[in-house]
């Protein structure tokens, strides 16, 4: 290959007559091609290369790695890796496998509660636990590869990481290697499996959405119980110390009354052998008011909140489905009206699936874009927009001022009257000067016209003064 290159170089230098030109071989080749291109004729180097490619024994092999940017290649590989990892994590087969393993692990945990089965199949149960833990660890690592900071924006991912982290610590710290804790953490993963089933996921989302309202109702019930516990200790503390001895005992008694289970046994303690009817009637009124407000109203508020949120979610889903149906019907009507356009309906396009499923390109990785940088960028955009708005206002005001100034005729009429009174000669000069000023104002901008007018006015005033002195 080197011999072929030397032969090309000698042939090219013999055609161009640049044998004595200094520089490296690559520089001389580039200079010869540039000179030939400037002269408007094909380069001898180009013709030589074309001839060489015509001869198989003298073809030049180009290494693709020498002309490829390694950084771009690495970015492409990283982007493709992230894309495939995202598809793997979202693939139904992977989700089904993970859910199946978690259900099997939950069944083994239930079977290990039996000491006989635990001892008999200890190795099998331990192997299943280790396999499930390994797959959970791989899921966390794949989530980090897909996007480390995006991983922490999902609450379920945080829960999975905490569970896996604690389960891994038990191999290094014996104090936390407690079977009850490990089994409880593994059972919590079943909640995430329920999110894969849409009806169950809808109910879980409704419950999570109702937590703030339920917390407010709980605070109200606790405040109500605290008030009635003070009343109970004050009124019945000496008569029934078993249930109203202090605040703690009274709160426990009222909690039993809210559950509506056991309040009859509590009220039976008010019926003593002496039959104090005042205490019995007072206790009956006390429990009636508390159970009516606390149990019937307070507990039902929880049901109302959850039911209302579920109804709102169902309505939102129905509205979205209705909008999709309306959009499909509108598309069908437009297709019937426009017979000239061979459009394909969206329902037909969705039904006809060919090849693999494709996801829209979401853009390249933004590894260097942090939240602080994004906030600063948004602030800069807002500042630029505000500056443009102020610039537009100032520009409009300047345009109005320019229009008003241009409407002034430079006091031409006043100057003509003054000059006509002085002399007819000065009047002709004024007429000439005013015409010149009009022409200049049309050709020049406003500032140059004002300067020219001032000069003409000074010259005309000097002429008038000289004429006035000569007359005297």
UniProtKB/Swiss-Prot annotation:
GO terms for molecular function: calcium-activated cation channel activity; voltage-gated calcium channel activity. The chain crosses the membrane at residues 91-112, 123-149, 154-177, 181-199, 213-236, 280-307. The keyword Repeat does not apply. Testis-specific. It catalyses: Ca(2+)(in) = Ca(2+)(out). One of its GO terms (biological process) is sodium ion transport. One of its GO terms (cellular component) is plasma membrane. Residues 1-90, 150-153, 200-212, 308-472 are cytoplasmic. This is Cation channel sperm-associated protein 4. It comes from Homo sapiens. The gene is CATSPER4.
């Amino acid at each position: 290959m080197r011999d072929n290159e030397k032969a090309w170089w000698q042939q090219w230098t013999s055609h161009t007559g640049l044998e004595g030109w200094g520089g490296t071989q690559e520089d001389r080749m580039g200079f010869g091609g540039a000179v030939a291109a400037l002269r408007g004729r094909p380069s001898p180097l180009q013709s030589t290369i074309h001839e060489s490619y015509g001869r198989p024994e003298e073809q030049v092999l180009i290494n693709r790695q020498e002309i490829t940017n390694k950084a771009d290649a690495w970015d492409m590989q990283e982007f493709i890796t992230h894309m495939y990892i995202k598809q793997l994590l979202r693939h139904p087969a992977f989700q089904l496998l993970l859910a199946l393993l978690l259900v099997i692990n939950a069944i083994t945990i239930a079977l290990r509660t039996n000491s006989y089965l635990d001892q008999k199949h200890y190795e099998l149960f331990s192997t299943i636990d280790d396999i499930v833990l390994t797959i959970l660890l791989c899921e966390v690592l794949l989530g980090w590869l897909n996007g480390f900071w995006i991983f922490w924006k999902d609450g379920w991912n945080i829960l999975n990481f905490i569970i896996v982290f604690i389960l891994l610590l038990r191999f290094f710290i014996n104090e936390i290697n407690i079977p009850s804790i490990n089994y409880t953490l593994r059972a919590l993963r079943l909640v995430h499996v329920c999110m894969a089933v849409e009806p169950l996921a809808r109910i879980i989302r409704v419950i999570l959405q109702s937590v703030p309202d339920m917390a407010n109702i709980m605070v109200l019930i606790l405040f109500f119980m605290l008030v009635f516990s003070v009343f109970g200790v004050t009124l019945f503390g000496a008569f029934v110390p078993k249930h109203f001895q202090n605040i703690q005992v009274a709160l426990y008694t009222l909690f039993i009354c809210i559950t509506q289970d056991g309040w009859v046994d509590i009220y039976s303690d008010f019926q003593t052998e002496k039959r104090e009817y005042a205490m019995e009637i007072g206790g009956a009124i006390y429990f009636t008011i508390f159970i009516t407000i606390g149990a019937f109203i307070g507990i039902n508020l929880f049901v109302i909140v959850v039911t209302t949120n579920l109804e709102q979610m169902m309505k939102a889903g129905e509205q979205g489905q209705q909008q999709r149906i309306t959009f499909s019907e509108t598309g069908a009507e437009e297709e019937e009206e426009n017979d000239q356009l061979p459009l394909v309906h969206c329902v037909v396009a969705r039904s006809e699936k060919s090849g693999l499923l494709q996801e829209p390109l979401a853009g390249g990785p933004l590894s260097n874009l942090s939240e602080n940088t994004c906030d600063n960028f948004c602030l800069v955009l807002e500042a630029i927009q505000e500056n443009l708005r102020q610039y537009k206002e100032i520009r409009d005001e300047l345009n109005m001022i320019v229009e008003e100034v241009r409407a002034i005729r430079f006091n031409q009429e006043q100057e003509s009257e003054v000059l006509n009174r002085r002399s007819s000669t000065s009047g002709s000069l004024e007429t000439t000067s005013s015409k010149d000023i009009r022409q200049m104002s049309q050709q020049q901008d406003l500032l140059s016209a004002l300067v020219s007018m001032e000069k003409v006015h000074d010259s005309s005033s000097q002429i008038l003064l000289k004429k006035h002195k000569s007359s005297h």
